[in-house]
Swiss-Prot record:
Domain GIY-YIG, chain residue ranges per copy: 4-80
SUPFAM superfamilies: GIY-YIG endonuclease
One Pfam family per UniProt: GIY-YIG
CDD domains: GIY-YIG_UPF0213 (cd10456)
Family named by the database record: Belongs to the UPF0213 family.
Protein name: UPF0213 protein SPy_1412/M5005_Spy1151
Length: 92
């Protein structure tokens, strides 16, 4: 049995706020958000753009990463996390 990849993702809304979620189909989920059929939070903040994502081996791992990311309360804390992890990806 193959395990489907899962993603924790961060969107930037048109009003510059950030939205975090998880999915097993990143491209489809982004399209759903931009069609106004995603989370209530993003429906009134369109369009949204993908700012960052991480890949996981399970939905549960992606959900855990989402929860940990959301513990960062301020935009600056979230952007600092993204900047650090994007640098790590480039160095691998």
């Amino acid at each position: 049995m193959t395990t489907k990849k899962a993603y924790m993702y961060v969107l930037e809304c048109v009003d510059k706020t950030l939205y975090t979620g998880y999915t097993t189909d990143l491209k489809k989920r982004l399209a759903t958000h931009n069609a106004g059929k995603g989370a209530k939070y993003t429906r009134y903040r369109l369009p949204v753009s993908l700012l960052y994502y991480e890949v996981f081996d399970s939905k549960e791992a992606a959900m855990s990463a989402e929860a940990l990311f959301k513990k960062r309360k301020t935009r600056s804390q979230k952007l600092a996390y993204i900047a650090t992890h994007q640098k790590e990806k480039k160095n691998h």
